[in-house]
Regions:
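Short, non-transmembrane alpha-helical segments in secretory-pathway proteins
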Residues: 30-51, 95-115
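A cross-family detector of function-defining hotspots
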Residues: 53-70, 114-133
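Short amphipathic alpha-helical segments, especially helix-boundary/capping motifs
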Residues: 16-22, 39-41, 76-81, 92, ...
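Aromatic side chains
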Residues: 45, 49, 64, 68, ...
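Sec-dependent signal peptide cleavage junction
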Residues: 3-43, 155
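Amphipathic N-proximal alpha-helical interface segments
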Residues: 12-17, 62, 66-90, 132-154
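Flexible "stalk/tail and boundary" regions
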Residues: 19-20, 106-119, 123-128, 143-155
Length: 155
């Protein structure tokens, strides 16, 4: 049976731009594995994602990244040292992509197949990270829930 997706509250302390900046600082730093995050972070995580299992923590630039599973779904999220949730993302099926996002993708790359899809909740935004494949070509797109394409990169 499918497990309901949690819908935790993302902090409103920071603007979307500030959150993006904080996440970028995490990504460019060398993150360290963490056995146990501060209790304020782990207790907030346990409230936000009570069914999480296979939990792995890392830290860099004062940001805690946690990767885990709920049911068969992979998740990743980011907390501040105060336990404020900045972003969470999870893998979704092609059937779960909103029509406007799917249509924007197909319009741009009609011959490509959907490969890996993540739904991202970052600040007040909902985005979709969509990887497409066509023969040997891969493209990764970042699309807002209204269908606006923010970024594309070929691999």
């Amino acid at each position: 049976s499918a497990i309901a997706q949690p819908k935790p509250s993302i902090t409103t302390k920071h603007t979307n731009d500030k959150i993006k900046e904080m996440l970028t600082s995490f990504k460019i730093a060398n993150s360290q594995d963490v056995i146990t995050p501060p209790s304020v972070v782990s207790s907030k995580f346990n409230i936000d994602f009570p069914q999480a299992r296979d939990i792995e923590w890392e830290v860099a630039s004062g940001i805690y990244e946690v990767e885990f599973e709920i049911g068969y779904t992979d998740y990743k999220c980011y907390y501040t040292t105060d336990g404020d949730l900045l972003m969470y993302a999870f893998n979704i099926n092609v059937l779960d992509i909103p029509a406007v996002v799917k249509n924007a993708t197909i319009a741009k790359y009609p011959d490509y197949d959907f490969d890996d899809i993540k739904e991202i909740h970052r600040g007040t935004e909902v985005l979709f990270d969509i990887e497409l494949k066509h023969r040997n070509i891969e493209v990764e797109m970042l699309i807002l829930e209204n269908g606006t394409i923010l970024n594309e990169k070929f691999d």
